[in-house]
Amino acid sequence: MALVSISPLASKSCLRKSLISSIHEHKPPYRTIPNLGMRRRGKSVTPSMSISLATAAPDDGVQRRIGDYHSNIWDDDFIQSLSTPYGEPSYQERAERLIVEVKKIFNSMYLDDGRLMSSFNDLMQRLWIVDSVERLGIARHFKNEITSALDYVFRYWEENGIGCGRDSIVTDLNSTALGFRTLRLHGYTVSPEVLKAFQDQNGQFVCSPGQTEGEIRSVLNLYRASLIAFPGEKVMEEAEIFSTRYLKEALQKIPVSALSQEIKFVMEYGWHTNLPRLEARNYIDTLEKDTSAWLNKNAGKKLLELAKLEFNIFNSLQQKELQYLLRWWKESDLPKLTFARHRHVEFYTLASCIAIDPKHSAFRLGFAKMCHLVTVLDDIYDTFGTIDELELFTSAIKRWNSSEIEHLPEYMKCVYMVVFETVNELTREAEKTQGRNTLNYVRKAWEAYFDSYMEEAKWISNGYLPMFEEYHENGKVSSAYRVATLQPILTLNAWLPDYILKGIDFPSRFNDLASSFLRLRGDTRCYKADRDRGEEASCISCYMKDNPGSTEEDALNHINAMVNDIIKELNWELLRSNDNIPMLAKKHAFDITRALHHLYIYRDGFSVANKETKKLVMETLLESMLF
């Protein structure tokens, strides 16, 4: 990566080292995990986290099922030793000066006397800089400037699209596709019918032969636009099909370059599996390698420098929050539950990849804690606990009294107390922003969640396979989307009285869609491993029960189609303007579905966290950007 001078700070040698190499030159931050097909605890298992039998403790004599999950892969000493100079005031001061300079670049699109700049490419200039600051993860500093720029573009928006400039005679695909995407994401009323201007009489998108770089970028922006589709938008489906095919063909012909890297990233992560911090990391690399993509050379340099500084400054905050989370985890006694998945580092990484504003610390930590708790609870209810123990635990948690632990098995006592104390802690945190005690509201969500888990535990115990609808309705609740999301959302600086909160929480359409999405997508990635552990019920098996003669492939095709439809409905729920839900809360709730979807791109990234998930942690949490 090229060096970028940020004098006077560039003299510091720390700027030229990655975080990993500067802290532990020879010791990796993670442990090497043996192949999951190894023999463990004296039992032979299959390569996909199969069922194994063990006792809860040497003296309880109870035979139990366990999911043979790999242990926490991250080295505690390494995490506690993390350190970076980017928390020092000098870096923040430099970033603040750069923010002022970038604002001047926004404002320079108007002349000093208020007249407009050249009409040659004034629309595309505005779209480019707005798109760039958003992809670089620094848009929060330029809210007013972004609004002014997009108001200007919208003023010249026509039914057949726009050209590069306000006086352009001919509309072009690049400006129109990028404009449509950006305006829609910011709540402007724009119709996808505008894309029909670039189709022929047969509905095929028209492109000039040769696949020039400019044309490829146009189709790339068409692809990005097509992913922000609402239900029933046929032209968006056609745009996605065309652009997907076109870009795949282009990748076979163009050389390896920053453009090909950008195409691969966009096609791999799209919209609904993309994460703001991961995109910032990738787009910094892309812009640095390909200055030809800069419409404004001065702006490009300033944006890159600011984005790198912001990435590394936030990294210093991530380290402190992760170190706090590690202490919470160790003090909770949860590490003693060796049968459970311990993924606190991974969950914090997800939280910090979507909540990239430094002031949302309570959200990041709350989400990481909630996700870790529901993962441990999932392992207790699905595999380790006996039906009698689970009934005891469910009854005790509903009474919400710490004295209830006296009636529980030893291994459940610490779990009960961590749930009890963490929910109460987040209730106090939420009271700071909401001005009221939300515990009773939150407890109802947890009670429904435990009831759904208890129902599934009975299915496993009785060998019962429900019909698809019964399984799906219960599975929405047991997906844990609601309990993982509710309290973190309440810590945001967004006023959410109960009547507004119910617009994104239960029983809202938004919550139903998000919970359904997580259940369906999770099952398509986990059903084989779950079946090997003795959990027969899944969306796949229940669909096949409802449809005798159908195959697993039939079931997967049906469920994948449901998932694609849900994503479009979630897009609509996020961007529709006729509700009174603060966008801050709605966007974070939406981004949680993106974060969880990201872990399911290739496999169950919760359970198998030593592959793609490890790469995400390294790139967005443990490695800083080089200058």
Swiss-Prot record:
KW Transit peptide (keyword) present? yes
Extract the GO molecular function terms from the UniProt entry.
magnesium ion binding; myrcene synthase activity
The UniProt entry's GO biological process terms, in alphabetical order, are: diterpenoid biosynthetic process
Binding annotation for Mg(2+) 3: D530
Q: What is its main location?
A: plastid
Q: Where does Mg(2+) 1 bind?
A: D378, D382
For binding Mg(2+) 2, which residues are annotated in this chain's numbering? D378, D382
Cofactor binding mode, per the note? Binds 3 Mg(2+) or Mn(2+) ions per subunit.
Q: Copy out the induction comment.
A: By wounding.
Name what cofactor the protein needs: Mg(2+); Mn(2+); K(+)
Whether Zinc counts among this entry's keywords is: no
Extract the Gene3D superfamilies matched here. Answer: Farnesyl Diphosphate Synthase, Terpene synthase, N-terminal domain
Q: Where in the cell is it found?
A: Plastid, Chloroplast
Pathway field of the UniProt record reads:
Terpene metabolism; oleoresin biosynthesis
- Keyword terms of this UniProt record: Chloroplast, Lyase, Magnesium, Manganese, Metal-binding, Plastid, Transit peptide
Motif stretch (DDXXD motif): 378-382
Q: Name one Pfam family in it.
A: Terpene_synth
Cross-referenced SUPFAM superfamilies, in alphabetical order?
Answer: Terpenoid cyclases/Protein prenyltransferases (SSF48239), Terpenoid synthases (SSF48576)
Q: Which Gene Ontology cellular component terms are annotated?
A: chloroplast
Q: Where is the transit peptide?
A: 1-52
Please state the Enzyme Commission number of this protein. 4.2.3.15
According to UniProt, the reaction catalysed is: (2E)-geranyl diphosphate = beta-myrcene + diphosphate
Q: Which family does it belong to?
A: Belongs to the terpene synthase family. Tpsd subfamily.
Role: Involved in defensive oleoresin formation in conifers in response to insect attack or other injury. Involved in monoterpene (C10) olefins biosynthesis.
What more the UniProt record tells us is: The conserved 64-Arg-Arg-65 motif may play a role in the isomerization step of the terpenoid cyclization reaction sequence.
Q: What is this protein called?
A: Myrcene synthase, chloroplastic
